[in-house]
């Protein structure tokens, strides 16, 4: 989809996006298609409208609290959960004060006895923040920012999983 097409405001946009997402990706080794193309197309169409009203740059004011910004992103942006919002903030350099709690990090915390929850148990912002509090406390004990610690844990656990296979 071209930038011009992305900016257009007609109702056919959602259908066009769904068609693109439903097609198989020729560059993919598995030749797989996108999961839930209609839902993702609807979310992208809604997201487009939301971002046209208030661009991301204005949502990421430097003086804002990272957790508050993440909560606002989750609340306002369709299809964006706490992990995705945290990853976005990290990738644009907005904050290393939020944790990215993926399956590898959660598995590590389970192995060392800090958590008993599964990955699906942190899908809401409330449970994500509760689990993030555990990650933050562990990061403080280790003497590193949570944004660097979760990265190191992710790399270590990913390598360990490959060794176990």
Residue map of PLM features:
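C-terminal accessory module of base-excision DNA glycosylases/AP lyases that mediates lesion recognition
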Residues: 40-48, 56-165
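Alpha-helical ds-nucleic-acid-binding substructure associated with the helix-hairpin-helix region
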Residues: 2-78
């Amino acid at each position: 989809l071209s930038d011009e097409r992305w900016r257009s405001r007609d109702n056919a946009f959602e259908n066009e996006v769904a068609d693109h997402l439903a097609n198989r990706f020729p560059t993919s080794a598995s030749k797989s298609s996108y999961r839930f193309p209609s839902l993702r197309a609807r979310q992208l169409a809604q997201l487009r409208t939301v971002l046209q009203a208030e661009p991301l740059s204005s949502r990421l004011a430097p003086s804002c609290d990272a957790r508050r910004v993440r909560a606002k992103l989750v609340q306002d942006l369709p299809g964006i959960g706490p992990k995705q919002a945290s990853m976005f903030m990290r990738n644009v350099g907005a904050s290393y004060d939020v944790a990215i709690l993926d399956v590898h990090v959660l598995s590590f915390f389970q192995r060392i006895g800090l958590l008993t929850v599964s990955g699906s148990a942190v899908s809401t912002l409330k449970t994500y923040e509760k689990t993030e509090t555990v990650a933050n406390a562990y990061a403080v004990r280790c003497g590193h920012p949570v944004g660097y610690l979760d990265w190191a844990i992710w790399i270590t656990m990913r390598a360990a999983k490959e060794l176990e296979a």
